[in-house]
Swiss-Prot record:
Source organism of this protein record: Lactiplantibacillus plantarum (strain ATCC BAA-793 / NCIMB 8826 / WCFS1)
InterPro entries the UniProt entry points to: Cold_shock_CspA, Cold_shock_domain, CSD, CSD_CS, CSP_DNA-bd, NA-bd_OB-fold
PROSITE patterns xrefs: CSD_1, CSD_2
Protein name per its UniProtKB record: Cold shock protein 1
Keyword Metal-binding: no
Keyword S-adenosyl-L-methionine in annotation: no
High-level lineage: Bacteria, Bacillati, Bacillota, Bacilli, Lactobacillales
Induction details: In response to low temperature.
First-listed, main subcellular location of the protein, grouped into a coarse class: cytoplasm
Keyword set, alphabetical order: Activator, Cytoplasm, DNA-binding, Stress response, Transcription, Transcription regulation
Length: 66
């Protein structure tokens, strides 16, 4: 698991970006958020996540808000 901070997240569109501790931005889709109910993130929120490779670059998986 990696630590990161939500750079931005658009709840209407269901995606955004997390900035990892290494300074790299990672795409996050709402389906990767591990919470009950409405899955959203807030700018500046701390999260842990797994990083996976996709056709479009790094993508977050198993995102857990802190």
């Amino acid at each position: 698991m990696k630590n990161g901070t939500v750079k931005w997240f658009n709840a209407d569109k269901g995606y955004g970006f997390i900035t990892g501790e290494d300074g790299n931005d990672v795409f996050v889709h709402f389906s990767a958020i591990q919470t009950d109910g409405f899955k959203t993130l807030e700018e500046g929120q701390k999260v842990t996540f797994d990083e996976e490779s996709s056709d479009r670059g790094p993508q977050a998986a198993n995102v857990v808000p802190q």
